[in-house]
Amino acid sequence: MAVAAASPWHENHEAAFDALAASRPGIVAHAAVETYSALTRMPEPNRMHPAEALLFLDDWFEDRWIGLSAAAQRLLLGRFSAAGIHGGATYDALIGATTAAEGATLVTADRRALVTYALVGADVELVA
């Protein structure tokens, strides 16, 4: 959602921007780092300057970054393994499990990850 909200050229930009603007969103710390990485590595002309990507994250999410302790993340791997979560879905599971642990709603346009989010007990709002 954050990449789409920050990127006027993105197909889900309007829905993502509106979803963020309608609330006081938080962001999973890992997802913030992924967002910064994605925004600053896009091919030109869509690539953001690092300072611009940081400003976006600061403006939209301020001090509302959430995350799990290292010990909690370590324990998650057992849950992921038992649930059959592996590969790239592991990162979706981390985001979902973090929002679930915080009692937050995960706002996403990523239909691909919905099963993974359900497996870790995330409350999900699908946008777009």
Please state what every model-predicted region is:
Residues 1, 111-112:
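Alpha-helix/helix-capping structural signal
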Residues 27-29, 88-89, 110, 125-128:
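Histidine- and aromatic-rich ligand-binding microenvironments
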Residues 63-111:
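Active-site neighborhoods of divalent-metal-dependent phosphate/nucleic-acid chemistry enzymes
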Residues 114-120:
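Short loop/helix-cap segments at secondary-structure boundaries that form the rim of catalytic
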